[in-house]
Amino acid sequence: MKTLTSVLLLVSFFFVSSLFAQTGPDRQLQYSKPADKHGLNMFETTKEETSEFVGLKVILGGSSTLQFQGLNHSNSALFVDDGNGANINELIELENNFNLATANLDLDVQLHNGLRMHLRTYLSSRHHPEPYVKSGYLQVDRLDFVSPGFLDNVMDMVTLKVGHMEINYGDAHFRRSDNSASLHNPFVGNYIMDSFTTEVGAEAYLKTNGFLGMLGFSNGKLNQDVTSPGETSLAFLGKLGFDKQVNPGLRLRLTGSIYTNGNAKQIYLYSGDRAGSRYYSVIKGITATRDNFSSGRWNPNFSGKLTAIMINPFLKWNGLEFFGTYENSSGGDSINSNDTRTWNQLAGEVIYRFGASEQWYGGARFNSASGKLANADAEKVTINRVQLAFGWFLTDKVVAKIEYVSQSYNDFAAGSIYSDANFKGIMAEAAIGF
């Protein structure tokens, strides 16, 4: 699926297939999360049977998102000669204009009772001009493919996932924009430290009476290969939590997650988003390449080992929502070093949804990340961000949002491009998802 031709052929094939596999307005598969507004504030899939199995069903979905960027940036870094008389710390000039339109193609297939497949392809993304597969997995909620009713009492509480997939570390990744899939993100940008990666692995879930437990593992690699023996070991992850609808107006959720890898040539947890940041070219020098995709976010660049812990409280009281994040990450400077350093991230957002169907919302988010740079003896630096957003769901599948963002970089060395750096301004985004 590396070429547009192959993707178009794939779309055509499954579109024809879906004409036969789908009937009526029901596009919901068993034990799945809706891609539109109905999936707001949904984290892991539940054990509630959202639809009845009637045979093979193919759902062709997707999303498309476009932003207008009106940001400016500044710094006070010292002049650093690139060898040709140019200052590598001079920031590139920005203009108010549109970013690249992004698009996803989703293929979801109900293969058997309680057995479904998900595949997502990035058709257009900031980091890759060509279409490529982001991830795919098989989810098992029933074992009827072994024999009808096999271990139903167990599978009433258990879910299994296996694939080259987005790992379930923390709750923040459920509310982030995944390339063009941005309906469930109240804001335009994701976190400063964007904890997201896709790795080959498996996860087992226990869900009962509001309790959630998950254990999983992955091979610790974003890019798969078989020619680097011993350089990366298995990564392990887990999650414990409680999610309860206390009464019709009040929902409470609290989870804690861990991801750990004791031997990795490269750590991908904070660099795994190949789609790219929403804030194009901010705090980048005049020599920066146009395909740079990480501007506006921060990768601590751990190597060799990592243990990351994330705690997420969530509260919804009628139209008022609070979602919080505390993250502590401790990792190695390099694969050959025993030194470790730590980064902490805090985030809190308050959203108020209103209107007959809560189609309008306003919200604010504060996000801060702080820690040591590559030298474990270096001084701690801090990055702070404030986001204010207002949004309108025109329909369940279309949202328009506008965001004010201000991000500052503190305590960086005078010779760093991030010295007293700041970017701020307005972002406007329109998104479609189905």
Where are these regions (language model features)?
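Short, polar loop/linker segments at the starts of domains and inter-domain junctions
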Residues: 75-85
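Hydrophobic alpha-helical membrane context
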Residues: 14-15, 211, 415
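Short glycine/proline-rich turn/loop motifs
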Residues: 84-87, 294
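Outer membrane beta-barrel
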Residues: 51-72, 87, 92-223, 229-263, ...
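Outer-membrane beta-barrel pore domains
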Residues: 23-35, 73, 91-92, 137-140, ...
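Detector for intrinsically disordered, low-structure N-terminal pre-sequences
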Residues: 6, 10, 15, 281-282, ...
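N-terminal periplasmic/intermembrane-space "pro-region" immediately following the signal or transit peptide
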Residues: 6-7, 13, 19-68, 74-77, ...
